[in-house]
Amino acid sequence: MKYDTSELCDIYQEDVNVVEPLFSNFGGRSSFGGQIITVKCFEDNGLLYDLLEQNGRGRVLLVDGGGSVRRALVDAELASLATQNEWEGLVIYGAVRQVDDLEELDIGIQAIAAIPVGAAGEGIGESDVRVNFGGVTFFSGDHLYADNTGIILSEDPLDIE
């Protein structure tokens, strides 16, 4: 499904939170949306592998990487796993790498930067926790919508039809 965050903001202005414009699109989908699962990890993506092995239909993995751009939390291998398991998208408050490969995948990926250095894979981090970045507090179960214009968040799903 295609989402237009500008239109959604016009319709649901009182019901959405708008994330500060920190993110760029790195994935093959220009827009995506779904119910979020939150993760908090710093320069370590081991936990992301565990979560992205699950079926992600209708879901978005939202990762608070502390805003670090020293190590990429998502690479082509991890994004391919997410695509295989039908995740709608990934929002990374941190960095990604292998961007030419990422843009070929049928998944939405928003992140703050790209860097060639990969993350550790020890599995250090937490999932289903409250995270805050970009002026918005995120909870697992919230609904996120993203496109090239921005990212918005709603407690409840928005009626898109």
From Swiss-Prot:
It is found in: Cytoplasm. Gene3D superfamilies: Ribonuclease E inhibitor RraA/RraA-like (3.50.30.40). It comes from the Bacteria. One of its GO terms (cellular component) is cytosol. One of its GO terms (biological process) is negative regulation of RNA catabolic process. GO terms for molecular function: endoribonuclease inhibitor activity; enzyme binding. Homotrimer. Binds to both RNA-binding sites in the C-terminal region of Rne and to RhlB. NCBIfam families: NOT-MenG (TIGR01935), PRK09372.1 (NF006875), RraA_entero (TIGR02998). HAMAP family: RraA. This is Regulator of ribonuclease activity A. The lineage of its organism: Bacteria, Pseudomonadati, Pseudomonadota, Gammaproteobacteria, Enterobacterales.
